[in-house]
């Protein structure tokens, strides 16, 4: 009888892990929906399985055998810990990002990305190799932009996830990139500013800057009123309000190269001499060993599936700026998945 070598076992194990790669995402979503992290956090002290089961915000009684198996998997994912002696559960360090109500919570991103509709395009990954239809449209019958405009619940879920990511990024911006916003900027337009999470943080950190949110009408209609922030609806492909700085966080990655060049040209038209575009977007580096290196590649596929856009390398960014007639640009890495790119048209 032929035996399987250790190397073959490792190779098979790698494929099995990838076959069930979805499991970690959906177990993570389950943990958020069950509020396991909040329950353990609010209890302060570690909890036994029975104690945890009795406090979960679900119909009682809880099937403790099934909860045990979910917790066993979550412990293996290193999100929670179990004491070998007391058999009581507590939070592992990454679990703090599963807690709601603080600026670095990742709960909204977890719920959105693992929503069945937003997962559906991934089942059409190969379909995009032929034809011009994006996987999102194949899966859900509409482009992502039309879909959002006619599905308010999904639009809110999506906006909450974008705000979640923006809070992570703006925390890094405020701490690491003050000079970018304090260098002769008195007015700033956040193009594609959504619900205003980014511009609110910018305005708080730099109160002398007059800030404006610019987005599509249905987005502006759902965005909250923010003190000292102006809201304008419109189409960035047609025009952009004038300002000393134009801020775009995760906007250009939604679009193909020709569309990005068009947007950048509208930016150039809106900027005075000395003005700049502040772009917060992924910069792919295939030689990087950074912890975010793989997620940046995942986001590239996500853009390909959902919008027909892409994440770009430094060389690809330079090509866009050159084609749009920009004079220079500078890339700054920050402690986030995205980098900051300052692009100067003059």
Curated annotation (Swiss-Prot):
Binding site for S-adenosyl-L-methionine: 162, 166, 192, 215, 235-236, 249
Temperature-activity note from the record: Optimum temperature is 37-41 degrees Celsius.
Catalysed reactions listed for this entry: norcoclaurine + S-adenosyl-L-methionine = coclaurine + S-adenosyl-L-homocysteine + H(+)
Protein name per the record: (RS)-norcoclaurine 6-O-methyltransferase
Binding site for substrate: 165, 250-254, 302
InterPro entries named among the record's database cross-references: COMT-like (IPR016461), O_MeTrfase_dom (IPR001077), Plant_O-MeTrfase_dimerisation (IPR012967), SAM-dependent_MTases_sf (IPR029063), WH-like_DNA-bd_sf (IPR036388), WH_DNA-bd_sf (IPR036390)
Distribution of this protein across tissues and organs: Expressed in buds, stems, leaves and roots, and at lower levels in capsules. Localized to sieve elements of the phloem adjacent or proximal to laticifers.
Gene field: 6OMT
Recorded metabolic or biological pathway in which this protein acts: Alkaloid biosynthesis; (S)-reticuline biosynthesis; (S)-reticuline from (S)-norcoclaurine: step 1/4
């Amino acid at each position: 009888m032929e035996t399987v070598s250790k190397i073959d076992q490792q190779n098979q194990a790698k494929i099995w892990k990838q076959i069930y790669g979805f499991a970690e995402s959906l177990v993570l979503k389950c943990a958020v929906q069950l509020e396991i992290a909040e329950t353990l956090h609010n209890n302060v002290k570690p909890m036994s399985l029975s104690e945890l089961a009795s406090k979960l915000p679900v119909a009682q009684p809880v099937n403790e055998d099934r909860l045990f198996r979910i917790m066993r998997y979550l412990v293996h994912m290193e999100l929670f810990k179990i004491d070998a002696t007391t058999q009581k559960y507590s939070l592992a360090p990454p679990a703090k990002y599963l807690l709601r109500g603080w600026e670095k919570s990742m709960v909204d991103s977890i719920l959105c990305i693992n929503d069945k509709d937003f997962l559906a395009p991934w089942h059409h990954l190969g379909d995009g190799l032929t034809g011009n239809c994006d996987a999102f449209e194949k899966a859900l019958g509409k482009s992502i932009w039309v879909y959002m405009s006619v599905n308010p619940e999904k639009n809110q879920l999506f906006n909450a996830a974008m705000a979640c990511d923006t809070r992570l990024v703006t925390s890094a911006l405020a701490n690491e990139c003050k000079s970018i916003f304090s260098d002769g900027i008195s007015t700033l337009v956040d193009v594609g500013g959504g619900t205003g999470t980014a511009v609110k943080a910018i305005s708080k950190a730099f109160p002398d800057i007059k800030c404006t949110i610019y987005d599509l009408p249905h987005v502006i209609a759902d965005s909250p009123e923010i003190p000292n922030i102006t809201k304008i609806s419109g189409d960035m492909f047609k025009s952009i309000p004038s300002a000393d700085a134009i801020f775009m966080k995760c906007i250009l990655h939604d679009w193909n190269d020709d569309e990005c060049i068009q947007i950048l040209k509208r930016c150039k038209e809106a900027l005075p001499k000395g003005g700049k575009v502040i772009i917060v977007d992924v910069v792919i580096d295939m030689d990087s060993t950074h912890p975010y290196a793989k997620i940046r590649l995942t986001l590239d596929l996500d853009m390909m599936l959902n919008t027909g856009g892409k994440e770009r390398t430094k060389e690809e960014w330079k090509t866009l700026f050159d084609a749009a007639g920009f004079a220079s640009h500078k890339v700054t890495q920050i402690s986030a998945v995205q980098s900051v790119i300052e692009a100067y048209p003059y």
